[in-house]
C-alpha cells in the first residue's frame, strides 16, 4: 500500500511540476507582452518628436489645428491601451495565484483519491468509442458492396452501349452507300426525262405541220365535191355532152366498186370466224406484242390507201376537163342520184355489220328492231361490248373500225366535242339512261345487265377544250381520275402522256346513249369523253399506245368535222390520205418508245407494291387503335378488386354487412334484380340511403385477410363440421347483427401454414362475392333469439375462388402464438413483438383501404418536368396489390361521371423532394411508386400519413415494416 501511495505522490508531483512550468510559460508570455508594449510606446514617442520637427520646418501653418487634433487622439488611444494591458496582467496574476492554491489543496488531499473509478470510466469510454467505430465500419462496408454492384452494372451497360454504337455506325455506312446509289439512279432518270421532253417538243412541231397540210387537203376535197354536184345537174337536164356523161358514170361505178371491195375485204380479213377462233386460242398461251400488231395494221391501211389515191388523181383530171365544158352553174341539183349513192353505201354497211355480228360472237348478238322505228345511221352502234372487245383483241385497231363504218365515226366525233364543252345535268342523264334501256333488247338476261351497266352515264368534271384546235390535251382529264398512289413518283413523263392505264381497263364502254328523232337529236346527246375513245389493250405499254391512237384520232376528227356531206368514198379517202402522211412519223416514234416503256414498267411495279404496303399499314393501325382497351371506368365499378389478369367491374363495398330488408328494398328499386346489379358492379343499397363508413369491424376483417394473401382459411365443409361453434354471447356484435365463428382447435388446421397456397382453376374467374349464410341455432333458445339469428348474416369474402369462405377469429389474433405465426408468414425476422402487432397492421391496412387525398405529379420518368400538379383521392386494394385513384372520393360523394384508374404496384422508393416539388403545406419527402407502366409520384399532406402509406406498402410487398439501419 505504501508503494502505491508513493507512486501516486510521485505522479501528483509530476503533475504539479507540469502545472508550474505552464505557469512559468504564461509569466514569460506576459513579460514579452510588456516588452512589446514598451517598444510600441517608444515608437510612438519618436513619431511625435518627428512630427514636432516637421512642424518647425514647415512654411505653411494651415494644418496646425489638424495635427493637434490627431495628436490628441493618439494620446487618448495610447492611454486606453495601457489600461487594457495592465488589466490583463492583473487577471493573469490572479489566475496563477488561484492555480497555485488549487495545486496545494490537491497535493494535500491526494491520499483520499480513488484511482479505480478513474480507470473504469476510462475503459467504458474507450469501449463505447470502439463499438461506435465498429458500427461505422460495418455501415461503410455495406455501402462499398452496394457501390461495387453498381459499378459492375455500369460496366455491363457500357459494354452493351459500345456494341450498339458499333452496329449503328455500320448501319450508317450502309445507308450512305445506298444513298449514293439512289442519287445516281435519280440523275439517270432526270437525264431520261430531259431527252423525252425534247422528243415531245419535236413531235408537237410535227403534228402542227401535219394539221396544216390536212386542212389544205380538206379544202381541195370540198372543191372536188362541188364539181361532182355540177356534173350530176348537167346529166339530168339531158345536155349534148356525151363524154361528160360517160366520165360521170365511170367515176360512180368505180367509187361504188372500190367501197364494196374494201368493205368486203376488210370484213373477210379481220372477222373470219375460223381465223378469229384460232387466233384467240393462241393468245391464251402466247401473248402478242401490241407494237407489232399496230405496225401491221398501219401498213395494211397505207397499202389500201395507195390504190384509192390513184382513183382520186384520175377523178381530178376528169373534173378539170369537165369544168371547161360546163357553162351554167346556177341550176338546182337533182336529189335522185345522190340519194341512190347514199342508199347503196348504207346497204353495204348493213351487210358488213351483220356479217361481223354473226362471225365474232353469234351468242351475244343483238336483235335489231324494224328499220322504220329508228334511223339507219344508228346501226353501227348496236354492237355489244363483248363483240368490240373480241374484235380489238384480234389485232383490229380503230383505223380498221373507222373504215368499216365511217358514218358512225362522224357522229362520234361531233358528240365527242360537244360532250367536252357541254354541261350535263342529272335529269338529262336519267332520261338518257331510260332511253338506252328501251332501245336495247339483248337475247340473254345476263348480257342485258352488262349492257345496261355499260350504257349508264356518269357526271364528270368538264374541261374547256377548243373544238377548232388540232390538239386535245388528255393529261388534265386523266389526272383527276388517277389516285395518288398510282402515279409515278420518281419518273414522270410529260403532262400530255398518260400516267397509267388501269382506269382505261376499268371504265370501258363503247355504247353511247341513243335517242330517237334523227341526226339532230343524236348530235345533242352528251356522252362522257373517255367512253367513246378508250381502246382495250394489253397491260404492256398501254399508256403509250393510247396516246398515239388518241393523237391520230384527233387528226381524223379535225378533218371530218368540217365536212357536211356523209359520203363513204370521201371519208375513206381523207382518212387514208392522212394515214400515209403519218406513217413515217409513227415508225420513227415506235423505236424510241419501246425502250422507254421497258424502263418504266419496272418502276411502275415497284411503286404499286409500295402503295399497297402503305395501305396495309394504315389498315393495321386502324385495327390496333380500335383494339386497344382504355375504356373509362365509371363510379362504383372497381374492376381491379378481382384478379388483375381478367378485367371485371366489381365493387369491394359489397363486402359490408347488409340486412335482408335492404336487399329486398334494392330488388324493388332495381328492375333486373339484386344479383344482376352485383354482376354489373352496381351497389345493392337503395339510392335514397347514402353510404356511411361506420362498419369498422368489417373493415378490420378485410384488413386481417390481407395478412394471409390468396389463402383459403376455412371452407364450407369445415363450417358444417363440429369444429365450428357459435359465439353465444354476441356482446360485441349486437350493433351489426352478425354472428362470430370461433375455431376450437385453431392450431390443428394446416390451412394456416405458409406453404399451403390454393390453386384456382384456369378457366374459372375469381372475384369477391357477397354470400349470405344462415347461422345455426340451438333448440333451447327463445323465439326472439331465433328471429334475430335468422335475420343475421355473415358476409364472406373469397380470396381464391367463389366456393371458399373467409371468416377470421378476432380473439385469437391477440395471442402471442398468432403474432409469431404472422411474423413467420410475413418473413419479418429481426423485429420485436410490438412492431408485428395485429392491431397496428389492421389500422394501417384499414387506413390505406379507406384512402387519402394526396398530391399527384405528372407520370414522367425523370424529375425535370414537375410544373403541373393536382389533387387526387388514392386508396389501395391489398388483395391484388393495386393502387387506385380518382378525382374525388367515390365512396361518399355522388355523381357517376367519376372515373377510377388503377395500376399494379411493383415497388416503392422514398426521395427527398427537390426544389421544384417543395411546398410549405406538404411533407418534404416524396413517394415514387414503381408500376408496370410509369412511376407515379405522390406527396402526402403530413408526415403521419406519409409513414402510414410507406409501412402499408412494405407490408403488402412482404417486406420489413421498419428500416433496420445500423446505429452510429
From Swiss-Prot:
A GO biological-process term: mitochondrion localization
Signal sequence range: none
Cross-referenced Gene3D superfamilies: Pleckstrin-homology domain (PH domain)/Phosphotyrosine-binding domain (PTB)
Coiled coil: 68-91, 152-240
UniProt xrefs under PROSITE patterns: PH_DOMAIN
InterPro entries membership: PH-like_dom_sf, PH_dom-Mcp5-type, PH_domain
One Pfam entry name: Mcp5_PH
Protein keywords: Chromosome partition, Coiled coil, Cytoplasm, Meiosis
Domain PH: 847-958
GO CC annotation: cell cortex; cytoplasmic side of mitochondrial outer membrane; cytoplasmic side of plasma membrane; cytoplasmic side of plasma membrane, cell tip; plasma membrane of cell tip
GO molecular function terms attached to this record: cardiolipin binding; cytoskeletal protein-membrane anchor activity; mitochondrion-plasma membrane adaptor activity; phosphatidic acid binding; phosphatidylinositol-4,5-bisphosphate binding
Entry function: Involved in chromosome segregation. Facilitates nuclear oscillation during meiotic prophase I, the 'horsetail' phase, by acting as a dynein anchor. Essential for anchoring dhc1 to the cortex. Required for proper sliding of the microtubules along the cell cortex, which leads to the proper U-turn movement of the nucleus.
Protein name per the record: Meiotic coiled-coil protein 5
Gene: mcp5
